[in-house]
C-alpha cells in the first residue's frame, strides 16, 4: 500500500531556512540525532554518529535544492501503539470491540482476519492509508504543495478500507494478497477505492486456496485442516506438461533425460521427500531469471 506522499515545497527566496506555505513563511527546524551502532560482528563496542536533520510540521525533509524543499508525509509516522492495539484485539469479546481496537490505527499495514462464536467472519485490509486530496504521486513523483489544501490531513476511514464481512459461502481467506478476492461470492470492485489502496492481485497461492475452499463442498474442521496443509504446486499443474513436451523435443542429454524422468514420475506436490518438487522449483527460479 501507498502509505506516504512526497511533497514539493517552495523555499523562501529571502531565507533558505524557511519555506512558503499557506501564504506565509515557515521556519525549517533542525535537530541533531545521535545514533549508536556496532562495527563488525565480533566486537561488542559501540560507536556513535551525530547527524543534523531538517524537519517541518508536515514531515521530515528528504531532499532540497536551491529553490525547492521535498518532505515525506507518512501515515504511520510517529505511531508507537501497535502493541497496545494487538493486545486490545486479543482481549476483544465481540466484533464491535475488535473493530474498536482497530480504530486505533496503530498498525501500519496488515491483512487481518476475524471469526467469533456468534458466527461472524471478516477480513479487512488494514493500513494507515492517507486520504489524499489529489492523485497519488506513487514512488516517483512529488506533489507540489502550496498550502494545506494540497496535503493530506487524515487517514481513509476504517469502514472505507477494503473488507468482507459475513459473505455467502461461509468463508474468507487471505494469503497476503490484495483483499479483493477474499470470497468469490463477494468480489470487491477496485474502482471503489482510491488509487493509493492496493490493487487487486490474485497470485498462485491465493488461487490454490480458492480451489481448496471456494467450491460447494461442506467442510468439517478436520477437512479444513487437511486442505490447509495441501502440498499441491499449482504452477506445476499448469506448465509441467509443456515443459516435458519441450524437453522431449530437444534431444536431451543424458543428465537432462534423467531429470525428465523425475518430472514425469512427479505428482506435482512439494512434500518433504519430493525430488520432483525440488527439481521443478530450481528450474522455475532459473527460468524466471532469463
Protein language model regions, located:
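Mature extracytoplasmic enzyme cores
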Residues: 1-256, 262-272
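Structured, charged N-terminal subsegments at the starts of enzyme catalytic cores
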Residues: 1, 269-290
